[in-house]
Design a protein with these regions (language model features):
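N-terminal cap/lid segment of alpha/beta-hydrolase-fold proteins
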Residues: 22-68
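Alpha/beta-hydrolase fold nucleophile elbow
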Residues: 146-157
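Active-site loop->helix "elbow" adjoining a glycine-rich segment at hydrolase catalytic centers
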Residues: 129, 157-160
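Alpha/beta-hydrolase active-site loop
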Residues: 123-144
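Ser/Thr-rich, Proline-interspersed low-complexity disordered segments
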Residues: 1-13
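Short beta-strand element of the alpha/beta-hydrolase
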Residues: 68-78
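Short glycine-enriched nucleophile-adjacent loop
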Residues: 160-171
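Short amphipathic alpha-helix adjacent to the substrate-entry channel of hydrolases
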Residues: 87-107
Length: 180
C-alpha cells in the first residue's frame, strides 16, 4: 500500500521558488522629465511589478546610442525608512558618476517607497523588493535605448542583498557590485 506524503511547498524566499516565478516587467513610462545631468537626461519613470505601479529614477546618456543600445546599471538602494524616502535624494553622487560613464542608470523606488504602490514590508524577510527589481530588469530589457545583453547591478546594504539574490535568480544580470 502506498502511503501518500505531503508535497513540500517551497518557501517564497527560496531561490527555487523565485526562479519558478514569472517576471514580465512592462513598458517604462516617462512620468516627468527632470533637470539633466552633465552628459545625460534624467527622468522620473514607472513600470509594473505584480500589478503595482513602481516608480524609479532613470538616466539616459546624451548622444548617439551604440548599435546594441546603452549598457544598463540597475541601482539598488539600501534601507531608507519608506516614510522619509524621496526618489531624487540620496545616492545621487553615485548615480551621477555611473551615468557620466555612459550607462543608463535605473534606480527603483521599491514598492511602498516614494509614490510607488504597495506596502513596504521589507527586503530581507519577504521577496517583494527582489520581485520589483527582477521586473525592473525585464522592463529594461524592453526599453529601446537599452542593451538587453549588458545589464548589471549595483547594490548597497539591503540593495546589495537584493543584487545578490537577483543575480542568483536570473542570468539576465551579467555583473554586480555589492557594497556592505
Amino acid at each position: 500500500t502506498v502511503i501518500p506524503t505531503a508535497t513540500p511547498v517551497p518557501h517564497p524566499l527560496e531561490i527555487s521558488a523565485m526562479r519558478a516565478r514569472d517576471y514580465p516587467g512592462s513598458d517604462i513610462v516617462i512620468e516627468e522629465v527632470l533637470n539633466p545631468g552633465a552628459n545625460y537626461n534624467r527622468y522620473y519613470v514607472s513600470y509594473l511589478s505584480e500589478g503595482l505601479k513602481i516608480y524609479a529614477l532613470m538616466t539616459v546618456p546624451y548622444g548617439e546610442k551604440p548599435a546594441t543600445g546603452w549598457p544598463v546599471i540597475i541601482f539598488n538602494h539600501g534601507y531608507i525608512p519608506p516614510d522619509v524616502y524621496v526618489t531624487t535624494e540620496r545616492y545621487i553622487a553615485y548615480v551621477d558618476q555611473i551615468a557620466r560613464s555612459g550607462y543608463i542608470v535605473f534606480r527603483s523606488d521599491y514598492r511602498g517607497h516614494g509614490n510607488s504602490e504597495g506596502e513596504a514590508l521589507g527586503g530581507y524577510s519577504r521577496p517583494d523588493y527582489t520581485i520589483d527589481i527582477l521586473n525592473a530588469v525585464a522592463s529594461m530589457k524592453r526599453y529601446p535605448d537599452a542593451d538587453p545583453n549588458r545589464i548589471g547591478m549595483w547594490g548597497h546594504s539591503m540593495g546589495g542583498y537584493i543584487t545578490l539574490r537577483s543575480m542568483v535568480i536570473t542570468d539576465d544580470v551579467k555583473v554586480g557590485v555589492i557594497w556592505a
